[in-house]
Amino acid sequence: SQPSMRLRF
């Protein structure tokens, strides 16, 4: 399980 990372540009 990978941590969900949301990158906002």
Swiss-Prot record:
Subcellular locations according to the entry: Secreted
Chief location: secreted
Leader sequence segment: none
Top-level division of the source organism's lineage: Eukaryota
Record-level GO cellular component terms: extracellular region
GO biological process: neuropeptide signaling pathway
Keyword Secreted assigned: yes
UniProt keyword terms in alphabetical order: Amidation, Neuropeptide, Secreted
Chain positions with Phenylalanine amide modification: 9
Family that this chain belongs to: Belongs to the FARP (FMRFamide related peptide) family.
Record-given protein name: FMRFamide-like neuropeptide FLP4
Organism expressing this protein natively: Penaeus monodon (Giant tiger prawn)
